[in-house]
């Protein structure tokens, strides 16, 4: 007799967005290429559902994969990034000359994280993942969210109190198992093989043979 099987969740940070326009920017050209490469790679895992936050940079990242699978992207507010007082989106790398940008570059992530309700964000992200596990027992699912939100989730799973302990790449993938008893088990963090520079360059120059 086989025992209970976990739900396998591919956790994805959104692709590279534009910056400085408004609070909910779309993907940049590079971000669109990252999303396409992600979809071409992850489709072989045959997710039965594709979830994303309702911010454009997240659901646009999920869209190519969903298209290849013949699925709709299920948008969830609970997968949003942490709240911020900013009125427009700024990519971390565009803050290089600010104190918080220097903290980010030096790996002092605690000094980069904005003041927000960390307990609430952690509870929301853990609740979202457990809900996905309940809806898709023993199946495979893809989830596109945000760097801070994913850090919070992964930190909870490994028992870390730090709200931001690594810098996930754009369109990078981490793998998590959601067990029927609610346990969250991290299987991998920050996979980027599908985003090899030569593949990204080839996609941007329409050399499709080199992306295969």
Language-model-derived ranges and their functions:
Residues 4-75:
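Active-site-proximal alpha-helix that buttresses catalytic centers in soluble enzyme cores
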Residues 9, 139-145:
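Generic beta-sheet signal
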Residues 17, 149-150:
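Short active-site segment of divalent metal-dependent hydrolases/proteases
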Residues 26, 69-127, 187-188, 199-200, ...:
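Phosphate-handling substructures
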Residues 44-46, 132-139:
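Glycine-rich phosphate-binding loop signature in dinucleotide/nucleotide-binding domains
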Residues 46-78, 99-103, 177-212:
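Conserved histidine-centered catalytic loops in small-molecule metabolism enzymes
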Residues 52-53, 123, 144-145:
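Short beta-strand scaffold positions
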Residues 160-185:
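Domain-level recognition of soluble alpha/beta enzyme cores
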């Amino acid at each position: 007799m086989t025992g209970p099987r976990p739900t396998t969740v591919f956790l994805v940070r959104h692709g590279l967005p534009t910056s400085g326009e408004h609070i909910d920017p779309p993907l940049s050209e590079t971000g669109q290429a990252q999303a396409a490469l992600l979809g071409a790679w992850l489709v072989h895992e045959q997710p039965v559902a594709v979830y994303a936050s309702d911010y454009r940079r997240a659901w646009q990242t999920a869209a190519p994969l969903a298209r290849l699978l013949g699925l709709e992207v299920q948008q969830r507010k609970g997968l949003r990034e942490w709240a911020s007082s900013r009125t427009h989106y700024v990519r971390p790398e565009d803050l290089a000359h600010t104190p918080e940008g220097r903290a980010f570059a030096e790996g002092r992530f605690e000094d980069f994280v904005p003041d927000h309700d960390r307990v609430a964000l952690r509870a929301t992200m853990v609740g979202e993942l457990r809900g996905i596990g309940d809806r898709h027992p023993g199946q495979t699912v893809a989830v596109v969210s945000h760097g801070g939100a994913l850090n919070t989730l992964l930190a909870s799973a490994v028992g870390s109190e730090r709200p931001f302990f690594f810098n996930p790449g754009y369109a990078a993938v981490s793998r998590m198992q959601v067990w029927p008893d609610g346990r969250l088990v991290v299987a991998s963090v920050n996979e980027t093989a599908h985003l090899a520079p030569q593949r990204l360059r080839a996609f941007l120059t329409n050399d499709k043979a080199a992306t295969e």
